[in-house]
Swiss-Prot record:
GO molecular function, one term: methylenetetrahydrofolate dehydrogenase (NADP+) activity
Subunit structure and binding partners: Homodimer.
Record's protein name: Bifunctional protein FolD
Ranges in coiled-coil conformation: none
GO cellular component: cytosol
Amino acid sequence: MTARIIDGKIISADLRGRVAAEVTRIKAEHGITPGLAVVLVGSDPASEVYVRSKHKQTQEAGMASFEHRLPADVAQADLLALIGQLNADPAVHGILVQLPLPKGLDSNAVIDAIDPAKDVDGLNPVNAGRLASGLFALTPCTPLGCIIMAKQVHASLEGMNAIVIGRSNLVGKPLVQLLLNENATVTIAHSRSRDLPALCRQADLVFAAVGKAEMVKGDWIKPGATVIDVGINRTPSPDGGKDKLVGDVAFHEAKDVAGAITPVPGGVGLMTVACLLVNTVRAASAIHGLPKPGV
């Protein structure tokens, strides 16, 4: 058996198209243009790539895109002052501060300063608490993308046994809450869990978000299970060439056991920016008291 490939390129393109349609409708019916502000501190090359991608896709969806670039040695007070300005700006419905921040800046204080209504990264404690309480919340983008991808295979996740490997605030913890909201039965595990392979073999859904290259082996997977691989790890090429990207799952082993699996690259990573656009449209609708959009 060879697993079905859950293609992030196709799914994210469809989602971006649906977002663009919602933006067009909101503009036509209400005269509102959803706006996303991205704050980049310093000049980290990887962050530069992400910011350019976000800017491009935001504009392609018909939304307003605002970029704010600050030097790596910016004072914490100046960064917080900018966030305060964006919180008060009616043209801005979503605020994203590109992480990680340079040394010397307090990421938690920055996240706390973002208006929860504009927190499109879903990291503000207010949104985390609302999600845990089963209330409407802006949800971290990667877990949201994971759920959308799982639902490409299963119309309903209700009653399914799911394991989430990883307990980060960015992925693992919010993903558990989203799965509980879907009425799945959830086990949360991590690199120090006892007999992790046995836990995985019980799962209909495996979400790997532990940040260790190819840690999850093919014989950990229950035959026919759906595997969502969140990991993005650079490993040296065996022939000494360019480094290659691999996930947290040993793809070439797992694809012969799983029923469906996301590749790396070409999987969950492509969903993250698409879900950022979803959150921006949802935030704009909530801020203006509009019905929840159809994305």
